[in-house]
Amino acid sequence: MLPSFGYHPWYIKQRTPDWQEHLVQHLEQHPSAVGEIGLDRWIKDFDLADQENVFVWQLKLAAERNLAVSIHCLQAWGLLFELLRAGPRPARGFLLHSYGGPKEMVEPLARLGAYFSIPGYFALERKMRQRETFACVPRERLLIETDAPDQGLPPERIEHSLFDPHTRQPIYHPANLAAVYRFAAEVRKEPLETLATQVEENFQKLFPIIAMGAPPTEAHKS
């Protein structure tokens, strides 16, 4: 398990004056990844300028340390692309979590170092556009996620149930990851074993075992 630390755009209004210092302290103790960070024009009363400032600062921090970044984006893909293109970006790349952007942006984002993760949530019938996009993601840029305990697979695909101990409401169990792999293989029309091997290779490139002392490389600037 690799911990990741960052200020999500939904919660930046709650940050304290010394948030940057606290984030650096966490990354000093666990230098594995930064995120989720990003931009979101979907939430109520969003302040895009503030989101941009917080995102750019965290992206620069990740680039300086060459840490992978997990990025959240809703309805701000053009701005996100421009900020990523301006850099700096981590040399090892960055993850676009539950990528829901245009299919046409996959190739230019991949050239900047993007990996694209597909969640089980995209198995919902109404997510046809997202499935078509992931069918086109370069195989060396594909990752899989559960997005547990939030948005999960459709009920008929869930293999492991979990309930909130306080509310008794169902929440999404991370053990459903294997079912997400099977869904992704369907979308890609690939053998499950082939897809799983490729995803493992991609994961190791983006999230190397920090404890093994993988040497950092310079950040991407253009």
Whereabouts are the PLM-identified features?
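H/E-rich (His + Asp/Glu) clusters that bind or coordinate divalent metals
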Residues: R41-W42, K103-E104, P108-S222
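Residue-level marker for buried hydrophobic side chains located in beta-strands
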Residues: A33, V69, F94, L142-I144
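Short active-site oxyanion
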Residues: N66-V69, R92-F94, Y115, L192
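Active-site gating/metal-coordination segments in enzymes
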Residues: M1-A68, R111-Y115, G120-E125
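Short, function-defining helix-loop hinge/capping sites that tune catalysis or transport
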Residues: Q14, K44, L48, L80, ...
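Short, cationic motifs built from Arg/Lys/His that form the positively charged side of catalytic pockets
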Residues: Q58, H72-L74, T146, R188
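Distinct, well-ordered alpha-helical segments
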Residues: T16, L23, C73-P88, L95-S98, ...
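Conserved, mostly hydrophobic/aromatic
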Residues: P3, V34-E36, A62, H97, ...
